[in-house]
Regions:
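Conserved N-terminal/central alpha/beta ligand/cofactor-binding core
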Residues: 30, 35-132
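Core beta-strand elements of the Rossmann-like FAD/NAD(P) dinucleotide-binding domain
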Residues: 2-5
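N-terminal Rossmann-like FAD-binding beta1-loop-alpha1 element of flavoenzymes
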Residues: 7-33
Length: 132
């Protein structure tokens, strides 16, 4: 049987899965996801820690996050790529929440942010002990 798709996503990591969800949400066509292993075996599932994003502009900002990322990468990282990733991270978090990711919250109902290696501010979001 021949199946027709408008989009083909290869791999089951967060980048491919996010793209597939965005295309599906936009109603742009049928999406096929092809992967050689189970979802649990993708590198994204093996990542440790959480997801870094500026979420509170009162105490954090993109400039600080970019600086932290460049330092952590020993200034070898492509500055333009780092800036793009950092500045798009908040929208990525909003998308993940829209798709059902339930990040940990504090008593006030705000994201329960953590500060982990290489970060000067509390900007790491988690879901229990599952994110990375």
């Amino acid at each position: 049987m021949i199946r027709k798709f408008d989009f083909l996503v290869i791999g089951s990591g967060v980048a491919g899965m996010s793209y597939a969800l965005k295309v599906a949400d936009a109603g742009k066509g049928k999406v096929a996801i092809v992967c050689k292993t189970t979802l649990e075996e993708a590198n994204t599932a093996k990542a440790q820690g959480g997801i870094a994003s500026v979420t509170n502009m009162e105490v954090d900002n993109f400039k600080k996050h970019i600086k932290d990322t460049m330092i952590a990468g020993d200034f070898i990282s492509d500055p333009a790529a780092v800036e793009q990733v950092v500045k798009n991270a908040p929208q990525g978090i909003r998308d993940l929440v829209k798709w059902g990711v339930n990040f940990d919250k504090n008593e006030k109902g705000d994201f329960d942010l953590h500060r982990e290696g290489g970060h000067s501010e509390f900007r790491i979001l988690h879901h229990a002990d599952d994110t990375g």
